[in-house]
Amino acid sequence: MATVHLPIRQLVEFLLRTGSIDSRFTGFDRALEGAHIHRKLQKAAGDGYQAEVFLSVERQAEDITFTLEGRADGIFTDETGTVVIDEIKTTAVPPEEITEDMNSCHWAQGMVYGAIYAAQQSLPELNVRLTYYQIDTDQIIRFIRRFTQQELDEFLDKLLCQYAPWAQRRIEWDVKRTQSLAALQFPFAQYRPGQRAMAGEIYRACRAGKTADCKGGTRLFCQAPTGIGKTMSALFPALKAMGEGNGEKLFYLTARNTTQTAAEDALTRLHTAQPELALRSVTLTAKEKVCLHPDAEGHPACLPELCPYANGYYDRIKDALTALLDGTGSFDRAALAGAAKRFSVCPFELGLDLSEWCDVVIGDYNYLFDPVVHLKRFFDSSGDWLFLVDEAHNLPDRARAMYSARFCKSSLTEAKRALGKGKSALKTALTKADKALLEARKACIQLAPRHSSQTDAADPAQTSLLPENTAPALELPEPLYAQDSTVFLQEPPSALLSPLRAVQAPLQDWLEANPDAEVHAQLLELYFAVQDITRAAERYDSHFVTQLTARGRELELQLLCLDPAPFVDASLAAGRSAALFSATLAPPSFYRSVLGCSGARAVALDSPFPAENLGLYCLPNISTRYRDREASVQAVSDALARLVQARMGNYFAFFPSYAYLRQVHEDFAARYPGIRTLVQESRLDDAARAEFLAQFVPDPAETLLGFGVMGGIFGEGVDLAGSRLIGCAIVGVGLPQVNPQQEMLRRYYDAQNGFGFDYAYRYPGMNKVLQAAGRVIRTPEDRGAVLLLDDRFAQQEYIRLFPPHWRHIRYLRSCEELAAALQDFWNK
C-alpha cells in the first residue's frame, strides 16, 4: 500500500478553500507574523492550556496510507471537564463581518485535529473552538462547536476519500519520476575538469541525509573554481540521489536572478539530452515582479474587488493544476504568466501552489531563510528536502539583512505632513511615535557626539541641531559602543517600539479607507517599514544589537542582526541535506561559524585549469588604504596602463568604492586618452547591465578597460569566457568601509572568538577579491592576467587566504618589471 505524507493544513485548504485571495485576511496573518499573537493568547490562557501540540496519525483510505501531521494551536479542558481543541486565527476582517461560518477551512482544521486527538485519548466527544483575533481592535471573538468522535472520524475519512485521486496522481508521478531519475545520464559527453569531484561530494551529502551526525541532516561546504560548471555539478548528483529515494524535493536557492537562469538552463539541458525525463520544476519570483494587475503605484492589489486574478482564485486553481500537471513541465516566470492569464489566476500564488507538485523549486534565498516570506507550506516543519545553496559566499550578509530592520524618524514626520491639517487617530499615533524618536535622537547625540575628522562642519546634515542645554526626555541605557553620533544598545528601548507598534492599526485603517489618495503610496511604504521593525523585535535576542544613529534632524533606528548563525541553522534543519557551494568559501571555519554549520564537511577543489594559463602579478609598493588613496591615484593609473598595453583585448579594473573608482578613472582618462574605458554606474537595471557587458565582444578591434566595483554586479556572477575578458586588476584588498556598524560587528566577533577583524573586514574583503579575479579564467582554453595592487597582498595574513592555484604569484617592484613580465606571459 502506497504512503502519502500530508500536512493537515495542506489537506484542508486544498479541498475546502473557495472564493478569492483577500489580503485583509490571508495577507495579515503572514505580514504581522500571527505567531506572536498566538503566543500572547496561549500565555493568557493559563497553566492548563497546552500550546502548539504536535499531532500525527496514519489513516487508510482508497488503498492509500496517509501520514497526517500538524500542530494544534491549543488543547485544554474546560470547567465542565470537556476537552477543547483551540484553533487561533488572526484577521483584519472588520469585527462585524466575523461570523461563525466565515471560513469552513478553520473549522475543518480544528475538526481534523479533534479526530486525531479523540482517537488517541479515547474521547467520546470534544469541543472545537475558533478564536479570532482582530488585529485592528485587539478584539477576540470565539465560536464553539461540540462533536462526537464518530462525527470527527467520518469527517476525516470523507476528506481523505476526496483527496485520494490527487494522492494517487502524486503516487503515480513519484514512481515515474524516480524511475526516470534512476536512468538519468550526465548530459555532456564528458565531465569538465573538477565537475566529477564536485558532483561526487554533493551526491554523497544528499545520500547521507539525516543519518549523518548533524542537526537537520548533512551540511556540505564546497568551494569549486569558477568555470567548471557548478550548476550542473550540483543539480545532476542531487537528482540522481532523488532517483534512489534520497530526497522528496529539491530546492535550488540563489542570490541573483542570473543564477536562477543558470539553474533553469541546466534543467533544460537535462530534458534535451533525455526527452523522456519525468521532472517538473518551478521558478518562484517576487510577487511585485510577476503581478499582472498592480495598482496605480505599481503594488500588487490582492483584493477580489480590485484584481480579477485574485477574485475567485480558489474556485479555479484546481482546474489550472489539473491541466498544468498533465505531464512534465518547467514553469519559469514566462510560463507562469502565460498559465495565469489562461486560467485567470494569480501567477504568484499559482507558482506557490505548483511548487507542491514540482520536483525542483528554484528561488531566492529568502524562500528558505527569510522568517517572513519563507515557504510555510514546506518549512514550518521538517521534510525530506534537498537544499542546494548557490553563491553561498553571499549568504552571511544576506541573512543578516533578512533578520535586521531599519526605520527612519523622517518617515513619520513626512507622513504627518502628507496628511495635512486636522485631527485623526492616525495623526495622533504618528505624533507620539515621532516625539519618541525625537527624544531618542537627543539622547543619542549626547551619548555619542560626532567626532569624526572627516566630518564637514559646514554640512547641515552632519551638524547637531540640539542646543547644549537641552536635556532629552528619554534616557537611554548605557551603550555597548558609541561613535560618530551612533549608539549601540543591548536591547531596543520599549519607549521607541511601543509607539511604533501603536501606529500599525490606525495606519492600516487609513490605507484601506483611502485607496485612491495621492499619498497612499507614501503611507504604504511607512506601513511596511513599521512592519519590518516590529517583526524584527519579535525575534530579537542576544545575536542582535540596537543601533541608533543621529544625522541632523534624522534618527535611524536599526535592530541589527550581527550573528545570523542560529537562524540559518534552524532553516537548514528543515531539510534532509544542504550543499552550500561557491568559488570562494575560504576559510571554511568562517563560513561554518557565521552560518551555524559547525559540524559541516568542507571541501576545496583545486582549479583544474593549467596554472600557466593565468598570469598572476602583484605590485606591493602601492598602498590603497583610505588615507593613501589620493596619493596612489597616478601609480594605480600607470599600473592599469601597463596591464592593458601588453595585449589588445578586454579588461576590468575593480575598486573598493565608487569614489576611488572615479578618482582613478578621471586621472586615467586624462593621461591615457587612447585607451577606451567604460565606467560602472551605481544602481544599473538589468537592461543597462546587459548593455554594459555587451561591450565586451570577442576578439575586439581595440582595447577596452571597464572600471567596476568589487562585490558589485560585475565583480561576480559574470561569465565572459574566451577573449571577451583577458585580464583584470584588483585595486585594494576589498575591506568593507570602516563605519560604526562594521566596528560593532568586529567587537561582537572579538568577544565571541577573538577574530573580530577577520570576520568583519579581512575575510569579506578577500572574498570580493577572489570573486573579481575569478572573472578571467572560465574555461580550460582561456588565458589571462590578474594584477593585484596593494602592499597587503604581500602580508601573510592575506597570502594564507590565497587559493592553491595562486601559488605561482609574482611580486614585482615597478611598472617596468610588470610590463616585461606581461610581455613574457603573452609571448608564451
Residue ranges and their predicted role:
Residues P620-A631, S682-F793:
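Conserved RecA-like P-loop NTPase helicase motor core
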Residues L336-V361, P371-F378, P506-S623, A631-V633, ...:
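A contiguous, basic/glycine-rich beta-loop/short-helix subdomain that forms a polymer-engagement track
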Residues A234, T261, K341-V360, Y365-A502, ...:
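Signature of the SF2 helicase/ATPase Hel1-core->accessory helical subdomain module
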Residues T178, Q185, N246-V361, F369, ...:
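A substrate-engagement module of RecA-like helicase motors
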Residues M1-D78, T82, A108:
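Metal-dependent nuclease catalytic cores that hydrolyze phosphodiester bonds in DNA/RNA
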Residues W173-Q223:
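Conserved pre-motif I regulatory segment
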Residues P656-E681:
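Conserved helicase motor "Helicase C" RecA-like lobe of SF1/SF2 P-loop NTPases
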Residues V57-E154:
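Mg2+/Mn2+-dependent nuclease catalytic core
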